[in-house]
From Swiss-Prot:
Species assigned in the record: Crocosphaera subtropica (strain ATCC 51142 / BH68)
An MF annotation (GO) of this entry: methyltransferase activity
Protein name as catalogued: Methanethiol S-methyltransferase
Cellular location(s): Membrane
Underlying gene: mddA
Gene Ontology BP annotations: methylation
Source lineage: Bacteria, Bacillati, Cyanobacteriota, Cyanophyceae, Oscillatoriophycideae
């Protein structure tokens, strides 16, 4: 009887972890769908470039603070030391899903509390300009999505970890590979994000702040990420760094 109860609890525990991972993933998906409208100024009543309702200084302080909260969460929870401490409190298979969940919540906070600054820097209101900018904006999202699948979408967002735990299979780290986009730049995912952030027919001060802060954050985060990748993959990644540019294809061997 006790053995059956232990097995039952084990199954319930694994089922909970699996459902938790699925919940975190779909929370992330909904956040991304909302981000398309928020950053692209489409479909939503409030977006990145909505009309200003606060003073310039107040809005700037709030917006930079919100982006700082996201950057802090995104960076701290990705550090090896934090993961080691965090997985003492939660099951290790839940770590990636929890990271995805907290990242989604941090983004939701940005969307919710964002204070638009309506000062316009550029405005391409003609049809040709809008088609070009929105096409590049859409291309950015496509590059982001495809890049995640090239390296393993389900591992990146925690589903592989919780599924293997549910199946009582050991997690194995992904092998180093450089498919498709990764043969031309080391970080195509971030190239996609840059297109998403910057390709807008209407650039307000708020949008410029958002794009600038996130771009600076990514450029700093890349340095930390590459140190981790070298630690994991060793000489393979060192050779890759020497042969493939960081962000701009066909310009030198290293950027």
């Amino acid at each position: 009887m006790q053995q059956q109860q232990t097995l039952s609890n084990s199954f319930l525990s694994r089922t909970f972890v699996l459902l938790y991972g699925v919940f975190c993933y779909f929370t992330f998906l909904l956040t991304c769908v909302y981000a398309v409208g928020f950053i692209g100024n489409i479909f939503l009543p409030k977006s990145l470039d909505s009309k200003s309702q606060e003073s310039l200084v107040t809005a700037l302080l709030i917006d930079v603070g919100l982006l700082g909260i996201f950057a802090l969460q995104h960076s701290v929870m990705a550090r090896k030391q934090f993961k080691a401490w965090w997985t003492r409190l939660i099951p290790k298979p839940m770590e990636r899903s929890t990271y995805v969940l907290f990242s989604s919540l941090a983004l939701m906070l940005v969307f919710w509390q964002w204070h638009p600054i309506g000062i316009t820097i550029w405005n391409f209101d003609n049809l040709v300009g809008q088609i070009i900018f929105y096409s590049l904006f859409a291309l950015g999202w496509v590059i982001v999505l495809v890049s995640t699948f090239l390296i393993n979408h389900f591992d990146l967002f925690g589903l592989r970890q919780v599924y293997l735990y549910f199946e009582e299979k050991e997690y194995t780290p992904l092998k180093f590979k450089t498919p498709a986009f990764y043969q031309y730049v080391r970080h195509p995912l971030y190239v996609g994000w840059f297109l998403v952030f910057w390709m807008t027919p209407i650039m307000t001060v708020a949008h410029l702040v958002f794009a600038s802060v996130t771009t600076i954050y990514i450029l700093v985060a890349i340095q930390l990420e590459e140190k981790d990748l070298v630690a994991i993959h060793g000489e393979k990644y060192e050779n890759y760094r020497r042969q493939v540019p960081m962000l701009i294809p066909f310009i030198g061997k290293k950027s």
